Amino acid sequence: MSAIENFDAHTPMMQQYLKLKAQHPEILLFYRMGDFYELFYDDAKRASQLLDISLTKRGASAGEPIPMAGIPYHAVENYLAKLVNQGESVAICEQIGDPATSKGPVERKVVRIVTPGTISDEALLQERQDNLLAAIWQDSKGFGYATLDISSGRFRLSEPADRETMAAELQRTNPAELLYAEDFAEMSLIEGRRGLRRRPLWEFEIDTARQQLNLQFGTRDLVGFGVENAPRGLCAAGCLLQYAKDTQRTTLPHIRSITMEREQDSIIMDAATRRNLEITQNLAGGAENTLASVLDCTVTPMGSRMLKRWLHMPVRDTRVLLERQQTIGALQDFTAELQPVLRQVGDLERILARLALRTARPRDLARMRHAFQQLPELRAQLETVDSAPVQALREKMGEFAELRDLLERAIIDTPPVLVRDGGVIASGYNEELDEWRALADGATDYLERLEVRERERTGLDTLKVGFNAVHGYYIQISRGQSHLAPINYMRRQTLKNAERYIIPELKEYEDKVLTSKGKALALEKQLYEELFDLLLPHLEALQQSASALAELDVLVNLAERAYTLNYTCPTFIDKPGIRITEGRHPVVEQVLNEPFIANPLNLSPQRRMLIITGPNMGGKSTYMRQTALIALMAYIGSYVPAQKVEIGPIDRIFTRVGAADDLASGRSTFMVEMTETANILHNATEYSLVLMDEIGRGTSTYDGLSLAWACAENLANKIKALTLFATHYFELTQLPEKMEGVANVHLDALEHGDTIAFMHSVQDGAASKSYGLAVAALAGVPKEVIKRARQKLRELESISPNAAATQVDGTQMSLLSVPEETSPAVEALENLDPDSLTPRQALEWIYRLKSLV
């Protein structure tokens, strides 16, 4: 900033500003001045554009007018929300000195830094979505990745082994803010992400990280957390924790542990799979018609966030899954009673985080009290549920009768938004506070008595006693009677139709009342802070309770969904395979206006791959996706949309379904498709579920068919993954004859003239035709074009009647082949006798042949 160059020429206040700004050069500085937060110089210019506020000038400092923009302090949350949503960070600078006793500028300091990944204020957060701060580290052995949800205290780390896994983690967690080292090599992995923050290398130093984490958790080592042997993850976690402390400017008592996320604990889904399955976000970027939109009828924001975490991280431990299934089954008869009570609990998880950060507002404490008031009824309802997991949740929930009583005594029923407004602490909680309030509140009676007395004494019927914020207490007399005012009345203010006066007695009372109001407010703030001190020792138990309540909300919700949507409980088996009877797509069945056609599926060690053929729009993609979604739902412990499901172990779910050009990276549709295919062929195992849709489009027919054949062969013979392979290459329907474990299925359609009816029903065997022209007609392609296409199709079929039976793995490759005419050069060579040529004739023949080619 050029203003710093001539620092001494500035006014004392601007010098103070410039010193503070120099400590936070990269971010906006909100500088408190009275009832406004002001921004100066480049900050003012940026803020005026980002917030659409006026850019003005403030006087001059160092001989130059100062660009300035300001926002009222009472509206700061709205403006912070706008900035955070745009990925900006803001340092909040408050007046901490007393203007009455300050010589020179009032003392100010930055009390907190608001960044996209470290916000905890209710107004700034999306209530049904996690808001994560993340850090990424890389060395020659792989990546380290850590995430922290400061609004709950949830702290995780992992060590993705390769670029694809790291990309999948970034997509799964979708951090609001991402810290990376200044020498980070894989910038293409993170560029374009919101909230990127470049950090110095020393912040990722391993010894510093261990020290920071041990200090935070009050431990001597990290063995108990299972992260001791995760150096890359610890480097990321250390940087992240330091950044959180720097921005919050306070201790973080709600962050009490760190958890290692291991690949083998959950079903791995890469970025393409999460996108294609539309788990929490549809392909257009919205939340409609996603799996979460169907499954999430939770009644608390913290329950909704937990369900989304489950959906993005299905667990492989069948003990956990069976426990969830048992709980859902046990709760099905109790959902109608439990959900209304759970709804009253609210977002206890985030309230506790604000309590830990000492930023909880009066209404947070009122909501906490309301949550505590629900616990006795919840516990009573759960007591009758015959389920050990439910009873374990009930115990973890606690009751907190003492804390409930404390908050009932301390906080009024409907407190104001801010403690600085006063009127938060209930009457009867503190005797001294009640005395100061009585003095302040007794003013009304006193003023009424004074008004009656002065009217009688002076005989002036227009005399009134009042108060305003600028001039304080006054006695008002109309202009017509003002000349009759007693001599001891001192003029305080002249109005158009009246005069206002003060008398020594009223002035003395005013000082007393204002002092009592100030004393009452100061004491109220002190008592409010003391409430934090009384609540914080119970923080760990309160966090466990919030976690149990969120889990109960998720499980009650899944029980309600299972009953309402006619889902069934899947059975887990030991061998790889998926057997589905009458399976349905959980999302499509909800948006259809007609009954959904349920379909079976059978994959087993003896039947590992299904080649799926049938018309476009016939339902191939729906059938494939519904299989993956049923598997995903089973592995979060949910019931599933089917009549019966048996499912074996799954380590990964892959989808190669649909593609679009990745223009930003300069990759064509075909390149995107091949990159995703390569990832599957490198990483799939016999326990993986693989969906492959239309491999080989975007290149020549022979290239595409050859690639599709080779991929299918590799998946069936070598990898032996559970595979659904949809294709338009009818040649692939010969695969079952050539290798074991492969079967044909098709989706049916009926054609009548130019019309087609899709049956959406899966049948064994290959499709008889693709119905491409009928689908084109349905799409509105002009009739003359369809007619010409039929004519051309008959021509091609007459030329190559066996096109559908082309042998891909042999030498015969006659797909749509046309008999070639004999070349003139070949004819000439066939009639040539080389032994009869002279050298000169031979040379002439070479030139003649050259002209024929």
From Swiss-Prot:
UniProt: ATP binding residues: G614, P615, N616, M617, G618, G619, K620, S621
Designated name of the protein: DNA mismatch repair protein MutS
HAMAP family found in the cross-reference section: MutS (MF_00096)
GO cellular component, one term: cytosol
Molecular-function GO terms, alphabetical: ATP binding; ATP-dependent DNA damage sensor activity; damaged DNA binding; mismatched DNA binding
TM region positions: none
NCBIfam families with a match to the protein in the record: mutS1, PRK05399.1
Lineage, opening ranks: Bacteria, Pseudomonadati, Pseudomonadota, Gammaproteobacteria, Enterobacterales
Homology family: Belongs to the DNA mismatch repair MutS family.
Originating gene: mutS
Annotated GO biological process: mismatch repair
Entry keyword DNA-binding: yes
